[in-house]
Amino acid sequence: MSTPVNYLIPRQKDELHKAILAYFSASGLSNTGAALREELGVGDEFLDQNTMKKYEGVLEKKWTGVLRLQKKIMELESRLSSLQSELDSATPTSLTRRNVDPSSWLPRAPAKHVLTSHRNSINSVAFHPIFSVLASGSDDTTIKIWDWELGELERTVKGHTKAVLDLDFGGPKAGVLLVSCSSDLTIKLWDPNNEYKNIRTLTGHDHSVSAVRFIPSAAGEYLVSASRDKTLRVWEVATGYCVKTISGHSDWIRDVEPSHDGRWLLSAGGDQTTRLWDASTAEHKATFLGHEHVVNCCVFAPPSSYPHLATIAGLKKPPPATSSSEFIATGSRDKTIKLWDARGTLLKTLVGHDNWIRALAFHPAGKYLLSVSDDKTIRCWDLTQDGRCVKTVDEAHSHFATCLRWAPAPAKEQTNGEAKTNGIPKAGEKVINVRCVIATGSADMNVRVFAS
């Protein structure tokens, strides 16, 4: 039967042996160390004084790390057991009574967690697509990695020399990466599977890099960035090469958003315009004119919202769900949110915020649009009621609310089974698997997680 050490490669075995010998030496167990050297057939040169210093304390750190991991696993197993028990005892009636229908869930105060560690304003938050991991980027030049389920800080990632302006998880299916961009003119790729090691730094922009996103595709090959240098750039993830530069804006580009299928790019800028681009050809397709100040944010509407937006647009039937760029939403420093069709026609202006709009997110089920603003609030706009604001989370933060993300969850198609709406099955419906979790960041230096 194989022992665990047999699964280690030679380099890992050497490191383990050196760590054990260093532990014996530090513990005064010289005879035991000598016996192990003899058993291994190695001399003093295997672990000289310099190497000894390097490996001192390694074994203890690994041991305490394993204990912490075991504790976390036990906590998660306990929570999983509790949630499974709740699920097993739930009925359609109880689910409806408790108002946990995911398609209608909206955030409410108080937040589930307030994550505190940053020392300056927070500019961006991003959810890991699989695990309960949340990243936040700040003016303090750091990235913080949190377990949003437990509300705990896992690590601080350092590397940028100026403010971290945006973050995103994505990339190749073989291994999810984290990308960040900064006022230091760089974009950095980090590997979550290797302690968030910086694996690549992308340079090429001539001014602050405002926004960055992985472009969705089967291979996860590319990412796109927006900059104060008035350009968008498309980069190859594997090499870090810039493969495309897109020009057209006449001022600082504040935001960029790819469509869910990666075919289109949407950019918003200080020139008060939003622009639609073909991602593969860089061809400009449409310009959205109507805001009276800087456009801070832009987002594509998901197909789940098409029926509601089609009604607002006065269409007899919604566009096909296979299309990825039928409607968009933009938020501006003019304190308004605007809804548009893909041709640049303004459909609706949503008024209610008392300060700059900083970020937008569509509810995955398509019924609502959420926004955060420098007025410190989260507002929820009901697209089935002509975009009426149906909920406001007042004082969501104690300072400007700067960023917003909805935790991702995959859509599932029910073909031979039954879908459920408000806990009541309906045959042949599409089920949107909504994760009822959002995160917001603020100039108050806190990240808040709102969850059901």
Curated annotation (Swiss-Prot):
Parts forming coiled coils: 64-91
Superkingdom field: Eukaryota
Subcellular location per the Swiss-Prot or TrEMBL entry: Cytoplasm, Cytoskeleton; Cytoplasm, Cytoskeleton, Spindle pole
Record bears the keyword Cell cycle: yes
Assigned GO CC terms: cytoplasm; microtubule; microtubule associated complex; spindle pole
A Gene Ontology molecular function term of the record: dynein complex binding
Domain LisH intervals: 12-44
Keyword annotations of the record: Cell cycle, Cell division, Coiled coil, Cytoplasm, Cytoskeleton, Microtubule, Mitosis, Repeat, Transport, WD repeat
Major location (coarse): cytoplasm
WD repeats: 117-158, 160-200, 204-245, 248-287, 290-350, 352-391, 396-435, 437-452
GO biological process, one term: establishment of mitotic spindle orientation
Gene3D superfamilies: 1.20.960.30, YVTN repeat-like/Quinoprotein amine dehydrogenase (2.130.10.10)
Pfam families (alphabetical): LisH_PAC1, WD40
Domain notes per entry: Dimerization mediated by the LisH domain may be required to activate dynein.
Family label: Belongs to the WD repeat LIS1/nudF family.
Function description: Positively regulates the activity of the minus-end directed microtubule motor protein dynein. May enhance dynein-mediated microtubule sliding by targeting dynein to the microtubule plus end. Required for nuclear migration during vegetative growth as well as development. Required for retrograde early endosome (EE) transport from the hyphal tip. Required for localization of dynein to the mitotic spindle poles. Recruits additional proteins to the dynein complex at SPBs.
Subunit structure: Self-associates. Interacts with NDL1 and dynein.
The protein's name in its UniProt record: Nuclear distribution protein PAC1
